[in-house]
From Swiss-Prot:
Name this polypeptide is given: Ubiquinone biosynthesis protein coq-4, mitochondrial
Pathway in which this enzyme or protein is active: Cofactor biosynthesis; ubiquinone biosynthesis
Superkingdom of origin: Eukaryota
First-listed, main subcellular location of the protein, grouped into a coarse class: mitochondrion
Localization, UniProt: Mitochondrion inner membrane
InterPro entries: Coq4, Coq4_euk
Lineage, opening ranks: Eukaryota, Metazoa, Ecdysozoa, Nematoda, Chromadorea
Gene from which the chain derives: coq-4
EC id: 4.1.1.130
Catalysis: reaction(s): a 4-hydroxy-3-methoxy-5-(all-trans-polyprenyl)benzoate + H(+) = a 2-methoxy-6-(all-trans-polyprenyl)phenol + CO2
Signal peptide: none
PANTHER family to which the protein is assigned, alphabetical: UBIQUINONE BIOSYNTHESIS PROTEIN, UBIQUINONE BIOSYNTHESIS PROTEIN COQ4 HOMOLOG, MITOCHONDRIAL
Further comment found in the protein's record: This protein may be expected to contain an N-terminal transit peptide but none has been predicted.
Quaternary structure (record): Component of a multi-subunit COQ enzyme complex.
Name of a matching Pfam family: Coq4
Length: 227
């Protein structure tokens, strides 16, 4: 454990406290995915160092990913001009993102701040994951309902290996019978293939592609939309 406070929002945890918080937040997050605070806490307390380090190394091995690690750009209300996004042509990534935020009545700043990561490099990896999660929904054309969230979590679980994403398995068990059948026979085979063949999403500079058509972004990411 790092007893030293490494950044403004940092909350150092003793090993036992981390385990207990991880168990408690996981239990709450799985039963009530709307609890963003518990989902965030589960994500951080279960994201062990080797997992985050693997993501960091994969980013570092990619030209764009390495640049992201060096410059550490943020996606927030301060860095994103939402009025400009709203005025972009239909079909662009930026317009899709603007519509996504408006439809959910949310903002880039709605994501909880990272608190429980004890490594500054891993801090950015977790923050970047959190801030780009919405773009994964957009690139995969998945809604934010239970079916869409479970599908996205499977993608992230395979690509990133984060335990909180792997927990999407439990979310699948909570799907209604009709949606569960659709997920197992349609979404699951598709998303497994996409996660394996697509470009590593954590090494993609979404903010530099707002003016690009979503279809072109999907091609660059090697994503084939679900039919």
């Amino acid at each position: 454990m790092s007893a030293q406070k490494l950044y403004g929002s940092h909350v150092p945890l003793a090993p036992l406290s981390r385990i207990l918080l991880g168990i408690g937040s996981a239990a709450t997050a799985i039963t009530d995915p709307r609890r963003g605070d518990m989902v965030a806490a589960m994500g951080e307390t279960t994201a062990v160092g080797p997992v985050l380090e693997n993501i960091r190394r994969r980013m570092e091995s990619d030209k764009i990913g390495k640049k992201l690690l060096m410059e550490k750009p943020r996606i927030s209300n301060e860095t994103i001009d939402r009025k400009w996004l709203a005025q972009l042509p239909d079909g662009t990534l930026g317009k899709h993102y603007s519509n996504f935020l408006e439809r959910l009545n949310t903002s880039p700043d709605a994501r909880p701040t990272v608190k429980y990561i004890d490594n500054l490099e891993h801090l950015y990896v977790m923050q970047r994951y959190r801030e780009t999660h919405d773009f994964t929904h957009i690139a995969l054309e998945q809604k934010t309902n239970m079916l869409g969230e479970v599908t996205v979590k499977y993608f992230e679980g395979i690509q990133y290996g984060l335990p909180m994403c792997v927990s999407g398995i439990f979310g699948g068990a909570r799907l209604l019978t009709k949606n569960r059948s659709e997920f197992l026979h349609k979404n699951l085979p598709w998303v497994v293939e996409q996660a394996k063949t697509a470009r590593f999403f954590m090494a993609f500079d979404w903010e530099n592609h707002f003016e690009s058509q979503l279809s072109d972004v999907q091609k660059e990411l090697n994503v084939v939309p679900l039919i």
